[in-house]
A protein has these predicted regions:
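Membrane-interface motif at the C-terminal end of an N-terminal transmembrane signal
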Residues: 21-34
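N-terminal Sec-pathway targeting helices
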Residues: 1-16
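Active-site beta->alpha N-cap acidic-glycine motif
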Residues: 32-121, 127-128, 138, 146, ...
């Protein structure tokens, strides 16, 4: 479960970007204590130049054996790729490994959400590292790739996150607090009213109402001309 505190992109990988031959992304704080990518980012797109506004749809706390496949069906039908931040112990439950394999094969981005959904900021460095590495191992076993992108539970980063150049911590800019309600309509309303180009939407695929809301959000925003991308494309393109 999330605290509801909205925080945006946490970009702590300047050296990694230099290594990849890309200019570092500039970041700034806005009045809501969220971090937003500056004018070099997708938020600076001139939509009037016939460039589609883009947003990223992200899901935490999965996979869930019953609700996640329904979500994947809806996204596939609409040709939408999303980003899933997975809890390691959930991946290992039941038949969930098959769901993760499907996510990967259908082009979704898979990220790390720790092994037990712990507050990384309250753990010793070694314990926090273990939480992340356990989930890395579980995901890599299925996809063949170690996740680079991380969403810290509750938005609370580990104490040494600035030194961890192998990970990119991703936050959010639109949080409808879907885990607090079963009213899918209310979730949809919040997202549609708050959305702007370049936003990162936070939802949870473990709740049926959130899955219903996600599909309706996709339909409404696609109708408004939005394109959905994974977070790597949002911050690196």
């Amino acid at each position: 479960m999330m605290s509801g505190k909205s925080w945006g992109y946490v970009v702590q990988f300047f050296c990694l970007l230099v290594f990849l031959g890309m200019s570092p992304l500039l970041i700034k704080m806005d009045g809501r204590k969220t971090m937003s990518v500056s004018s070099d980012s997708v938020r600076s797109q001139n939509v009037s130049d016939e460039v589609k506004p883009v947003v990223a749809l992200t899901f935490d706390d999965g996979p869930n054996a019953s609700s996640t496949p329904i979500l994947l069906d809806g996204l596939k039908e609409r040709k939408v790729r999303a980003t899933f931040f997975l809890i390691g112990e959930n991946v290992e439950k039941d038949e969930n490994e098959k769901i993760v394999k499907r996510m990967y094969e259908e082009g979704h981005l898979i990220g790390n959400h720790t092994y037990t959904h712990c507050n990384l900021s309250k753990l010793e460095t070694g314990e926090a590292k273990k939480e992340l590495e356990q989930t890395d191992t579980v995901i890599e076993k299925i996809t063949g790739k170690q996740p680079v992108f991380v969403r810290a539970p509750y938005g609370e980063l580990p104490v040494d996150s600035e030194q961890d150049l192998n990970r990119i911590y991703i936050g959010w800019t639109v949080d409808p607090l879907d885990w607090m309600t079963e009213d899918a309509g209310a979730v949809v309303k919040t997202v549609v009213e708050e959305i702007n180009p370049g936003d990162v939407i936070l939802l949870h695929d473990c709740y049926p109402s959130s899955v219903q809301a996600a599909i309706r959000i996709v339909d409404l925003l696609q109708g408004k001309g939005y394109e959905f991308v994974t977070v790597d494309h949002l911050i690196m393109d």
